[in-house]
From Swiss-Prot:
Biased composition (Low complexity): 19-38, 57-91, 153-187, 227-283, 416-445, 555-564, 572-635, 648-661, 680-700, 780-810, 849-880, 995-1067, 1088-1118, 1225-1249, 1257-1291
UniProt-annotated stretches for the region Disordered: 1-95, 150-204, 224-289, 401-477, 529-661, 680-760, 776-810, 849-899, 980-1118, 1161-1185, 1209-1321, 1348-1402, 1421-1441
GO biological process, one term: mRNA export from nucleus
Official protein name in the record: Putative uncharacterized protein DDB_G0293878
Skewed-composition ranges (Polar residues): 39-56, 636-645, 729-751, 981-994, 1068-1087
Compositional bias (Gly residues): 881-892
PANTHER family given in the database record: NUCLEOPROTEIN TPR, NUCLEOPROTEIN TPR-RELATED
Molecular-function GO terms, alphabetical: structural constituent of nuclear pore
Stretches with biased composition (Basic and acidic residues): 703-720, 1362-1373
One Gene Ontology term, aspect cellular component: nuclear pore
Superkingdom assignment: Eukaryota
Length: 1441
């Protein structure tokens, strides 16, 4: 066929020449560039044979050009240097495969390859996929070097791919295409896959490349030459620019490139055409045809294997593959990032299965290949695939390990050792006579065997490149025969090596999370949870164990069943981490040995180690496990239950073995976080750190009872320490609080534990965690246990939990002031005596964790004065805390006593939050964010709950906040919806990125808003308001959402600061409130940093005292007005959208009315800040805020606070109620601000007015605006759910408004404020009527949804409101689906006196049970979801994301 002469780039000639000339170029190692263009060998002989004969005949003038094409000069094996380099590169997997000869000798069939009859496009697709994965090759990889170096030809060993191709060609029924087509196929596949992938990925970023690595030995020439020429002309240059090393060709390599091209131009043209065809295939990759074929290919590619061997499913059953597939499905980003991991898993697992296939197909290369060739005719020997696999290994390792190479090498060394062990162990396959050393040496030795007849043949082919092609073909066929034999041997060996490698990789993957910092672990845990959401309720550990090896299963079953039964989902995961990690440490070790070890370690360690917090402790320890892969899997992968010294010791051992390796790979706590940890640990280590570390040491076989005893003892010890710390605790004195536990845990476990090696510290921490989980677990009433107690008292278990429950009950019984006083005292005592434990594995986690931990720590450990001053540690630890305590320093310490009220509330909040964190406050684990060490395994279940089964998790773990009215409110766990929103840590898979954990952390922070819900505990007086704070609880959980959303908004704030610290700190001090936090820290005060700063500026709470001032109405109103107006303006100035979200968290509002008002101002301001999107958008918000304060927080208990629309003066009753209203008003205020803005712009207020329907027109608008704004700010999340639904502004608003109206029945009362559509809703909400009312708003919303969140109509608060809508709608939409049903759900479930269910509603939203419904009802919801991840980064992430 006449091929278009490919455009000759400068490199094109040489490229073609070298491709033509270099048979070696066929190997990726030699002709990296040549491989791109010319290698004929590469394409699967079978695939080439049947389809490619056509395509070859079409695209390539003659199949027999195998002899004519210099690419037929196949190195018998990939260059030994490459193999050795690969081995040397620590590309263990590759090295396992790269017995250069052995690798080629490995049956390509055993080497996973495309089905024999792949269409050229399929082959191209596979190549593209492979090339896409090939891009993973590190520049250091020998292949990349070879690929880039022309001297690669000179390397002693010929590229594997070339011999593989001819070998395949030589295979029965395989026609060795002599045409440069083969050459073209091979060179491209042989081309350093990284280059190919880079080029292809650049050209074709299709997910297929990333998604499914397909063997590259596909004939790229399958596409018609002219098409390929056309496309390749476009794409040939990049390939040609990578000059393939000119290999000795029959045509003299001495010829000038022009001469060579002229002499070889037919071949080169063919090759170029083929390359062009390849590229055209690549170009056509984007085409549905190609992709469809590719998909068919893949199905064929996989199915033949599964058909050939049912074991193909085995890798599918492989927990890692399974996990990654699930994660891949659920997390496209992660799938992309992990796709390489998935594909090597496929490959490895298939290889593993193929190993047995090899055994069955056996030494007969032809017969084995034939028998197996049904599934695979493509030569797995194709070097490009080896390189690809190497690259995939690198890629997987690099992606799995942020520091893939160093860790990869370390882990490869460990894996090589482990592979030697495993291979020696696994060398039972009988392949291992050679395989004993294959992993480390055997392959290298094998590949190093230039003496092998294959290499001799290859060399002869190389050197004989001038010899007649027939001779070359004969030699090549002989070489292929030898290679087939060797490949069968090597392939078996490599299968073992790969199997072992796969296990190693799985172990590493398991270990990697351990090595990974807590964020990454949390992300991995999130992935685990994400994949096993349905399983999560039982416990990821159980799941992981079940999915893990039977041994892991057995042990995990024991451990899981122990705590798993009641601790299931929430504590169970943590307890599974603790107990299961204790019991399952071996099981986790077993699981570590198993793929489930990855899952169990990831699940138990990561899921349970949402105890990633626990794992972080182990993390520092476990990362060492990476080198001791087996030990790590057996030991470290359990990633210490946070005091599960079994694994902890082992991880420590492995840690001792290779902490250095882990360090580059592990996302260790940032130095800031370490500093925080150190700062925290300075205090917390004093308390419990050493004891915890000491106790945790040798708890390898710690039984649950033993752990409980140890925990009790450690709790007693910590009570001794923490008792002094919390000596002023009302009911918690003498028993370490959860904060104490966090502080001690953080102290011991921050950054892997300050005393990471102090296993006793882990032990005690684990014990505390176990006891805490037990306490949670034992606290049958979610009310008392979830409300304050579990969080407050972690270690004593049920005792301290009961104490806290009693304390909570007392608090609920006590007046708000008494509670506040007690909590103030406790907080003061805690803050004075206990160190603040701020932990963050990453800056964001630090911020988030610091935020939350700062809450707890500042609340629990340090007095606000110490927060003011001591928080300087916190300040240094949590930057926003610094701002909070520093800026609030004077005022904060001045208002410290007031803040202690608030902080006492905050202690309750903190306890509540801790409980929330434990219960689901933070995917990272509220404790994790709090301790950051993962030591507090209790937190990990909540992350699991959030990430996995929102509803089930919420149901199980959402702390039931005992409202002061005695009503129970589930604090909705906020799932890290922002998971997809990228996080600062991209080392972890994107959806695993800190935003997920940070979202969890913001959930922690929003556990400050679960301080709001906790404030529901604290504000049991303010219960309905707190329920409106449960709207704030929803805001708490919605603030969790706001933290999640505010993680999204914190992501927004993360935009402001992916420094979750400030946001977290802000959220922490959202509850922390108050003036202190506000004045002290932007983030601390109002929950968002800039937001807080504006709050701080506007709120400063004027004086922290003003918040605390009994003149709540006066100060709060004036202050709120001032703060709101100022804050709104400031927050407008502050980029407070995301900060506003955090400020929404401030909505936690110390239940101290003043504090609440302060918080309300902060909350208002923070809501204004939350609404600052709206506020930023709605500059009228000050005015509007004043209006919207009309919103009454509590319909029943609290009179509607008719704050002057202009003055926000709380006309109503209790300062607390007012403050709660104010906080509610803050929610509604900021919402009202938005609504006022909307009210001011009543056109959108009509939409908002429907939103206003729910709340007062103002509050509804506020909610709607907050819905609009708090779409970004779930903070308004009674409105926030509405806000989230305010993406579905009207419908969700109505729903949410209904919910909010349910919760905010009173808000319905203040229907004035220009809510056109305002309709006061009593506790009962008329969804249909709402919907009818909302039809307009809904129409608006839909318009907005249709035209974008920023499309004006939906919210008319203004451009900023739209902006918030764009953010909030996305966020809202992200939640809004559940919001619809949540309304009715809230009606029934949230029938508590305070229709606080909005938080439950939000909780439900978090669960997202109705999310789809809302999505159904609201187009923007999907749209928002589609944009959520995008907006997450933009705005710090949409709220729910």
């Amino acid at each position: 066929m006449g091929f278009l002469t490919p455009k000759k780039t400068k490199k094109g000639k040489d490229k073609n020449e070298s491709n033509d000339n270099s048979f070696d170029g066929g190997s990726s190692s030699y002709n990296n560039n040549n491989n791109n263009n010319n290698q004929p060998i590469t394409y699967t002989p079978t695939a080439i044979r049947s389809p490619n004969n056509k395509t070859m005949s079409q695209s390539q003038t003659s199949i027999p050009t195998l002899s004519s094409s210099p690419s037929l000069n196949y190195p018998s094996s990939p260059p030994n240097n490459n193999n050795n380099n690969n081995n040397g590169n620590g590309n263990e997997v590759i090295s396992i495969f790269n017995n250069s000869n052995n690798y080629n000798n490995i049956k390509y069939t055993h080497r996973l390859s495309t089905p024999p009859a792949l269409q050229p496009q399929q082959q191209q697709a596979i190549k593209d996929l492979l090339s896409s994965t090939a891009s993973t090759y590190s520049s250091s990889s020998p292949f990349s070097k070879l690929a880039t170096t022309n001297g690669g030809i000179s390397q002693p060993t010929t590229p594997i791919s070339s011999p593989s191709q001819p070998f395949q060609s030589v295979q029965p029924n395989l026609i060795i295409p002599t045409t440069p087509t083969t050459t073209t196929t091979t060179p491209q596949s042989v081309q350093p896959i990284a280059i190919q992938q880079q080029q292809q990925q650049q050209q074709f970023p299709s997910t297929i490349q990333n998604t499914v690595p397909i063997l590259q030995p596909l004939a790229l020439n399958t596409i018609k030459p002219h098409q390929q020429q056309q496309q390749q002309q476009n794409q040939t240059q990049p390939l040609q620019q990578q000059q393939p090393l000119p290999l000795p060709n029959q045509q003299q390599p001495n010829q000038t490139p022009l001469q060579q091209q002229q002499s070889q131009q037919p071949n080169q043209q063919q090759q170029q055409q083929q390359q062009q065809q390849q590229q055209s295939l690549q170009n056509s990759r984007g085409e549905g045809e190609f992709e469809n074929k590719l998909k068919k290919n893949l199905s064929v590619w996989v199915s033949p294997v599964s058909n050939k061997k049912n074991k193909l499913n085995h890798w599918q059953s492989c927990s890692d593959l399974e996990l990654y597939n699930k994660l891949k499905i659920r997390e496209p980003e992660f799938a992309q990032s992990m796709s390489c991991a998935i594909s090597p898993f496929h490959y490895l697992k298939i290889q593993y299965d193929l190993e047995s296939i090899d055994q069955s197909s056996g030494g007969n290369s032809g017969s084995g290949t034939d028998s197996f060739s049904d599934g695979f005719k493509v030569d797995l020997n194709f070097d490009g695939y080896t390189e690809w696999y190497k690259g995939m290994n690198r890629k997987v390792k690099n992606r799995i390990h942020s520091n893939g190479k160093s860790h990869h090498k370390a882990s490869n060394d460990a894996m090589n050792n482990n592979n030697n062990n495993n291979n020696n162990n696994n060398n039972n396959n009988g392949n291992n006579s050679n395989n004993g050393n294959i992993n480390n040496n055997g392959i290298n030795n094998h590949s190093g065997e230039d003496k092998s007849p294959l290499k001799k043949m290859v060399k002869s082919l190389k050197s004989g490149s001038n010899s007649s092609k027939k001779e070359q073909q004969q030699l090549h066929q002989q070489l292929l025969a030898a290679q087939q034999q060797q490949q069968q041997l090597v392939h078996q060996q490599q299968q073992l090596a790969q199997q072992q490698l796969h296990q190693q990789i799985q172990k590493q993957i398991e270990i990697i999370p351990i090595k990974v910092n807590d964020e990454q672990k949390q992300h991995l845990d999130f992935l685990r949870r994400h994949e096993s959401k349905s399983v999560v309720p039982t416990s990821p550990t159980i799941k992981g164990v079940q999915s893990g090896a039977g041994g892991g299963n057995t042990g995990n079953t024991d451990g899981v069943n122990i705590d798993n039964m009641s601790l299931d989902d929430d504590n169970n995961n943590n307890n599974n981490n603790n107990n299961n990690n204790n019991n399952n440490n071996n099981n986790n070790n077993n699981n570590n040995n198993n793929n489930n070890n990855n899952n169990n370690n990831n699940n138990n360690n990561n899921n349970n180690n949402n105890i990633a917090v626990n794992t972080p402790t182990t993390n520092a320890t476990i990362p060492t496990n990476n080198s001791t892969t087996n030990n790590t899997n057996n030991t470290a992968t359990p990633s210490v239950i946070n005091g599960d010294s079994k694994q902890q010791e082992q991880p420590q051992q492995s840690q001792q073995q290779q902490p250095q390796q882990i360090t580059p790979n592990t996302l260790l706590l940032s130095t800031d976080s370490i500093d925080l940890l150190n700062t925290l640990n300075k205090d917390s280590n004093n308390v419990d750190n050493n004891n915890n570390n000491n106790n945790i040491d040798d708890n390898n076989s710690v039984s649950r009872e033993e752990m409980e005893n140890i925990l009790k003892k450690s709790q007693q010890d910590s009570n001794k320490d923490l008792g002094s710390v919390y000596g002023n605790e009302d009911s918690n004195s003498g028993s370490p609080t959860f904060q104490d536990f966090q502080s001690s845990a953080a102290a011991s476990n921050v950054s892997g534990g300050i005393d990471d090696k102090s296993q006793t510290g882990f032990k005690k921490l684990g014990e505390k965690i176990l006891s805490f989980f037990r306490s949670r677990k034992s606290s049958d009433s979610l009310n008392s246990s979830n409300s304050n107690i579990p969080i407050t008292n972690i270690s004593p278990g049920r005792q301290s939990q009961q104490q806290q429950q009693q304390h909570i009950q007392q608090i609920s019984q006590q007046s708000q002031q008494q509670i506040q006083q007690q909590q103030q005292q406790q907080y003061v005592a805690r803050t004075q005596s206990s160190s603040s434990i701020v932990y963050s594995s990453s800056a964001q986690q630090q911020q988030q964790q610091q935020q939350f931990q700062f809450q707890q720590n500042s609340v629990s450990s340090q007095s606000l004065q110490s927060l003011n001053g001591g928080n300087n540690n916190n300040n240094s630890n949590s930057g926003s805390i610094n701002g909070g305590s520093n800026s609030g320093g004077g005022g904060v310490s001045n208002s410290t006593q007031q803040l202690p009220d608030q902080m006492g509330l905050f202690n309750i909040f903190t306890q509540q939050q801790q409980q929330l964190i434990m219960n689901g406050g933070l995917g990272v684990g509220g404790i994790n964010g709090l301790v950051g060490t993962g030591v507090i395994g209790g937190d990990s279940p909540p992350p699991l709950s959030r990430s996995q089964s929102h509803a089930s998790f919420q149901g199980k773990f959402a702390p039931v906040i005992i409202m002061e009215d005695g009503s129970l409110h589930l604090t909705p766990r906020i799932l890290p919806f922002n998971v997809r929103g990228g996080s600062t840590n991209r080392t972890t898979p994107p959806f695993l990125t800190p935003n997920t954990s940070q979202t969890n952390l913001s959930s922690l922070v929003n556990n400050n808003n679960n301080n709001s819900s906790h404030s529901n505990n604290n504000n049991n007086n303010n219960n309905n308001t707190n329920n409106k704070n449960n709207n704030n609880n929803t805001n708490n959980s919605n603030n969790n959402n706001n933290n999640n959303n505010n993680n999204n908004i914190n992501n927004n704030n993360n935009n402001n600061s992916n420094k979750q610290t400030a946001n977290n700190t802000t959220n922490d001090f959202s509850f922390d409130q108050n003036t202190d936090l506000r004045s002290s820290t932007n983030s601390l005060t109002i929950g968002s940093n800039s937001n807080f700063s504006s709050l701080k500026n506007s709120l400063n709470l004027e004086n922290p005292e003003n918040n605390n001032n009994p003149d709540k109405n006066v100060d709060n109103n004036n202050f709120i007005n001032e703060n709101r107006n100022v804050e709104i303006n400031n927050e407008k100035n502050e980029n407070n959208e995301s900060n506003n979200n955090d400020n929404v968290k401030v909505e936690i509002v110390q239940f101290d009315s003043i504090n609440v008002n302060s918080n309300n101002k902060s909350l208002k301001n923070s809501f204004n800040n939350n609404n600052n999107e709206n506020i930023n958008n709605n500059n009228n918000e000050n005015e509007n805020n004043n209006k919207s304060v009309i919103y009454k927080n509590q319909q029943e208990e609290r009179p509607i606070i008719h704050i002057d629309d202009n003055n926000l003066n709380i006309e109503s009753v209790n300062g607390d109620k007012n403050s709660l209203r104010n906080s509610r008003d803050n929610n509604n205020s900021s919402s009202n601000n938005n609504n006022n803005n909307l009210k001011n712009s009543n056109s959108n207020n009509s939409l908002r007015n429907s939103n206003e329907k729910r709340d007062l027109n103002i509050s509804n608008n506020n909610n709607n605006n907050n819905n609009n704004n708090n779409n970004n700010n779930n903070n308004n999340n009674n409105n926030n759910n509405n806000n989230n639904n305010n993406n579905n502004n009207n419908e969700n608003k109505n729903k949410i408004d209904i919910d909010n109206n349910k919760s905010l029945n009173n808000s319905n009362n203040s229907g004035g404020g220009g809510s056109k559509n305002y309709r006061s809703y009593s506790n009962d909400y008329d969804l249909q009527e709402d919907i009818d009312r909302m039809n307009f708003n809904k129409l608006q919303t839909e318009i907005k949804q249709i035209f974008g969140h920023n499309s004006g109509g939906h919210r008319s608060s203004g451009g900023s409101n739209r902006h918030k809508d764009s953010i909030g709608d996305k966020e809202m939409d992200y939640y809004s689906s559940s919001d619809e049903d949540d309304d009715s759900m809230d009606d029934s479930l949230l029938s508590s006196p305070d229709p606080s269910p909005p938080h439950i509603f939000f909780f439900k939203t978090i669960h997202q049970p109705n999310k789809q419904n809302v999505k159904k009802s609201f187009a923007p919801l999907k749209f928002n979801q589609q944009n959520n991840s995008n907006n997450n980064d933009d705005l710090g992430g949409s709220i729910l994301e």
